[in-house]
Amino acid sequence: LYSPANGEIYCGLVDYLTDWAEEKGYDYVLDEDSYYGHPQETNDLITPEGVVGFVKSLGLSVSVRDYQYQAIYECLKYNRRLLLSPTASGKSLMIYSLVRYHVNANRNVLIVVPTTSLVEQMYKDFKEYGWNVGHYCHKLYAGAEKYTEHEVVISTWQSIYKEPKKFFDKFDAVI
């Protein structure tokens, strides 16, 4: 996870590394990157109450649980989060809420899933939540057109991992 070639680690590990460094009494400095920003950047405009209000404004026909609101809040407040959630815990609903937030803010979103069946499932779930998926979402796998004007691309990692960096430039958020 650490690259000796460039001296970098995955941003998702920063919290673990800083906790370890503090526990051991090490001093450290987190530098801001011109492309990625600061690894512990926060969005001070995001509040738990605001997240609840936003999700309720989506008019979902399903109940949203407290832990789902908390996960959505964490992702929006802290910009970079790794969410671990068990099967049937409503991950699609959490992802949908995050996607809707970003699309409402005029951001393009890339959703990466491990299998083609999950591309289809995510698309279907978004449709069941009442969104016009045909207008907003593009499914990308197994030879589908990679370049689209849709705001949201749902793809398998296998379909995009060999793409040049330029392919990813249009995306403002990756889930």
Identify the residue ranges that each predicted region occupies.
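Charged, low-complexity intrinsically disordered regions
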Residues: 1-30
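Conserved pre-motif I regulatory segment
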Residues: 2-4, 20, 31-84
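Walker A/P-loop
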Residues: 63, 77-102
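Hydrophobic positions in the central parallel beta-sheet of the AAA+
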Residues: 83, 111, 153-155, 174
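Conserved strand-helix element at the start of the C-terminal RecA-like helicase core
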Residues: 86-87, 92, 108-119
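Conserved helix-turn-beta segment of the N-terminal RecA-like "Helicase ATP-binding" lobe
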Residues: 109, 116-144
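Conserved motor-coupling elements within RecA-like helicase/translocase cores
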Residues: 142-153, 167-171
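SF2 helicase catalytic motif II
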Residues: 157-159, 165-175
